[in-house]
């Protein structure tokens, strides 16, 4: 799969988990297993090549339950990552939350997250400065 201006992935086999044609101008990823999975994740990744970097994406996602998530991950492996994601909370509706996975132990460093509008896109951003990583959204 080739994503213009982003990266070339000649060895990737997305099959039915990703599409550049279902919605022209957008990359659509279809859900699979969690970031903890060693098998079928729906994940597009690029290697961090500098201590100073920014990654930003626009996400349109309307989850129907708490098991559905989409977002931006700072990912080392299945046991070590931070994941800023849109999901669903039965009390607050659509929310933005962070999962921290440290050596396989998951936690929610900002609690249950923050409410966001029920519909519409959300911009997610990751900024790193040496040993510091910061997520932001708009």
Regions found by a protein language model. Give the residues of each.
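Extracellular glycan-recognition regions
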Residues: 1-138
